[in-house]
From Swiss-Prot:
A divalent metal cation 1 binds at H9, H11, E97, D207. A divalent metal cation 2 binds at E97, H133, H157. The gene is yjjV. This is Uncharacterized metal-dependent hydrolase YjjV. Pfam families: TatD_DNase (PF01026). Belongs to the metallo-dependent hydrolases superfamily. TatD-type hydrolase family. The keyword Metal-binding applies. PROSITE patterns: TATD_1 (PS01137), TATD_2 (PS01090), TATD_3 (PS01091). Its EC number is 3.1.-.-. Its cofactor is a divalent metal cation.
Length: 259
């Protein structure tokens, strides 16, 4: 099966994939999705994500502490991340999912920023790119990224900010994750941003099982839906479909060094 697409962000360690891995990967492959990057969200599931990557050839792992799960992260969690990265597992391709999130009544933003800084330091130490979560925090996140100046940079996944914010990330060397949001006609701002950014700055993703596509609301998202995201992306861009597909693959290989 030819790998036409890579889903650069899928939580394959979550239901509905748990216990259905073989069939889920087969469905993805039939849609042309030949490789999938699985970002961890907390130290408790590092072992699960690593085992998935080790046991299933299409899967690659990222390890990180998600800002939206702050109550689950302790200093010990950070030590566990460092220890896991120190072992340099062959199929760990990034630090993530990490970042900043201002959702909720008490986001503990100072602690979030400290945790982000510590994880950016680890990414730099172990020469890995980062997979970034950002909700209502694009400008602040860009400040942190500029200060740390990672040589391998990373991707801002699920981007839904302004063109100016996206261009700032791109100027810093970061990619922009393109997912199901662009399948919603009402998401005109995001669609316009993705249409205008350089093709070399884009990556394909689903964020499955979250972020269902337009027409699939209420259903778990799945990695094979990356093909539908790609189809909509082609409607928004001027380049030929084959050129877009090849660029997305090249961008992913370059950033994550996925073999």
């Amino acid at each position: 099966m030819i790998c036409r697409f890579i889903d650069t962000h899928c939580h394959f360690d979550f239901p509905p994939f748990s216990g259905d891995e073989e069939a889920s990967l087969q469905r993805a492959a039939q849609a042309g999705v030949g490789k999938i990057i699985v970002p961890a969200t907390e130290a408790e599931n590092f072992a699960r994500v690593l085992a998935l990557a080790e046991n299933y050839q299409p899967l690659y792992a990222a390890l990180g502490l998600h800002p939206g799960m702050l109550e689950k992260h302790s200093d010990v969690s950070l030590e566990q991340l460092q220890q896991a990265l120190e072992r340099r597992p062959a199929k760990v391709v990034a630090v993530g999912e990490i970042g900043l999130d201002l959702f909720g009544d008490d986001p503990q933003f100072e602690r979030q920023q400290w945790l982000l800084d510590e994880q950016l330091k680890l990414a730099k130490r172990y020469d890995l790119p980062v997979i970034l979560h950002s909700r209502r925090t694009h400008d602040k996140l860009a400040m942190h990224l500029k200060r740390h100046d990672l040589p391998r940079t990373g991707v801002v996944h699920g981007f839904s900010g302004s063109l100016q914010q996206a261009e700032r990330f791109v100027q810093l060397g970061y990619k922009i994750g393109v997912g199901g949001t662009i399948t919603y006609p009402r998401a005109s701002k995001t669609r316009d941003v993705i249409a205008k950014l350089p093709l070399a700055s884009l990556l394909l993703e689903t964020d499955a099982p979250d972020m269902p596509l337009n027409g699939f609301q209420g259903q778990p998202n799945r990695p094979e839906q990356a093909a539908r995201v790609f189809a909509v992306l082609c409607e928004l861009r001027r380049e030929p479909a084959d050129e877009i597909a090849q660029a997305l693959l090249n961008n992913t290989y370059t950033l994550f060094n996925v073999p």
